[in-house]
From Swiss-Prot:
Belongs to the SlyA family. The lineage of its organism: Bacteria, Pseudomonadati, Pseudomonadota, Gammaproteobacteria, Enterobacterales. Homodimer. This is Transcriptional regulator SlyA. The keyword Cell membrane does not apply. PROSITE patterns: HTH_MARR_1, HTH_MARR_2. GO terms for biological process: response to stress. The gene is slyA. HAMAP family: HTH_type_SlyA (MF_01819). Residues 2-135 form the HTH marR-type domain. It comes from Shigella boydii serotype 18 (strain CDC 3083-94 / BS512). Transcription regulator that can specifically activate or repress expression of target genes. Residues 49-72 bind DNA. GO terms for molecular function: DNA binding; DNA-binding transcription factor activity.
């Protein structure tokens, strides 16, 4: 049986994203789209699809469908990597810039509201604990 902590963390992520999702509705972005755009914006420029999939925590085939949709909307471009022709580099387009600004403002405002009443020290402790949990899980996965 899963520990209550795992369920609590999963529920927290689900309701956190649902709140942001609701607030981003006017921008006509699905959760998959805004999570992908947010990660592209946060990562260093010209990330590969593989790096982006890892950052988001999804499989590459799922990401490709989302990137196809974002490319159709003119929000990203993909270019073949010079050093590896099988790899694609992802870039936000100029058309995406105002949308990203609005999206990031909504996300930042929502995060600030969610974290209201939590001190900087408490937040730092939480971040440290989450990093430790992630490290332990990655080590356990590596062991098989």
């Amino acid at each position: 049986m899963e520990s209550p902590l795992g369920s609590d963390l999963a529920r927290l992520v689900r309701i956190w994203r649902a709140l942001i999702d609701h607030r981003l509705k006017p921008l006509e972005l699905t959760q998959t789209h805004w999570v992908t755009l947010h990660n592209i914006h946060q990562l260093p420029p010209d990330q590969s699809q593989i790096q982006l999939a890892k950052a988001i925590g999804i499989e590459q085939p799922s990401l490709v469908r989302t990137l196809d949709q974002l490319e159709e909307k003119g929000l990203i471009s993909r270019q073949t990597c010079a050093s590896d022709r099988r790899a694609k580099r992802i870039k936000l387009t100029e058309k995406a810039e105002p949308l990203i600004s609005e999206m990031e403002a909504v996300i930042n405002k929502t995060c600030a509201e969610i974290l209201h009443g939590i001190s900087a020290e408490e937040l730092e402790q939480l971040i440290t604990l989450i990093a430790k949990l992630e490290h332990n899980i990655i080590e356990l996965q590596a062991k098989g």
